[in-house]
């Protein structure tokens, strides 16, 4: 079949205009075009048709070195990437090219990054708890298998560390496969994650097919087109694992979903669309919906997704984080005030929510303990103004006891992480759900009122707190 060839007529940053002279052969919207610059393959994705013979494209690679008059070939289909077992243990970029220096991904099947979401009849409605081993999450905002989880937080409060710990705790204990999509984050973190996975055995370099994870990176230095599409590339790999054989349970980590929105905003501005609120693209809700609706569980397999969501200027009402709220089953909100107290993970126990914190799903005891913990912490929060102005002495005996318990609960919500051992020197802890419930139940009932607050800081189970208390007395 004769190739459909066009020529570059205009280049403005990441936006490239291509003119096709074949009448009636204008490529479709979202088709991938290819051109070669010094033997390097450059992929362009069609975003708009301008007139009868010109298309406006978004570049997936750097446009450095491109010149007007260069030949461009229509591939006849959207961006397509390798999927399946062969991607395990490998790192790909947005267009499916390996970037780990280990050669071509051989023998894999090819799939378009654009697909429709599963129909209602295919979707599963089962609700099972996913135990993470992180006390504050398991107790107050539990995650579901096949659910969508958002980690909200401003700059530097620990979203990536929490994602790394979840990969460590859940992906290692988890039988299925894991896909990690690095969207517009630091290259250093992506490199650290890759080497940590090799050290921990999640990636097997000798026999890549025995690895548990596939990585897809489109980092901060990439053009906006790549950052706006790399989440779809990662999701396509995750969907292929979910639908394999008789179905699989897949974990899909995205760090960071805000960068997906941010890249969409840059692309939108480059294409000349009129911005909406706070300068975001007018299609913000549509873009987010197209991605999130595909992250779902079917009757064959499930995708459990954990998404880090950067919150600009710590403002949860910003359109980017606010748009993603509607799609999530559980939200874990990281708070700068809690991080300032030195309590890590800096999860806000009152702002974090979960649809499965329901006595019908988690059981009466878990639900009652969680609500009691939140009640004590809420009372302490409302008393803080009085304490700041008048001091502790002006409180009633009952309020003093509540404050004392709240401070112990606050410290007991902290926990040493496996992935932070290098920085803290403290051994990481995985706490079972039964131990978490028992520990907090004892605290709310006043069993440990005589122990010092420091005993509860950075420990795993309540038994460890009791041991620590002996060394403090």
UniProtKB/Swiss-Prot annotation:
The keyword Translocase applies. It comes from the Bacteria. GO terms for cellular component: plasma membrane; proton-transporting ATP synthase complex. CDD domains: ATP-synt_F1_beta_C, ATP-synt_F1_beta_N, F1-ATPase_beta_CD. It holds the Pfam family ATP-synt_ab. Its main location: membrane. Its EC number is 7.1.2.2. ATP binds at residues 153-160. The keyword Transport applies. SMART domains: AAA (SM00382). One of its GO terms (molecular function) is proton-transporting ATP synthase activity, rotational mechanism. It is a peripheral membrane protein. It is found in: Cell inner membrane. F-type ATPases have 2 components, CF(1) - the catalytic core - and CF(0) - the membrane proton channel. CF(1) has five subunits: alpha(3), beta(3), gamma(1), delta(1), epsilon(1). CF(0) has three main subunits: a(1), b(2) and c(9-12). The alpha and beta chains form an alternating ring which encloses part of the gamma chain. CF(1) is attached to CF(0) by a central stalk formed by the gamma and epsilon chains, while a peripheral stalk is formed by the delta and b chains. NCBIfam families: atpD. Belongs to the ATPase alpha/beta chains family. PANTHER family: ATP SYNTHASE, ATP SYNTHASE SUBUNIT BETA, MITOCHONDRIAL. This is ATP synthase subunit beta. The lineage of its organism: Bacteria, Pseudomonadati, Pseudomonadota, Alphaproteobacteria, Rickettsiales.
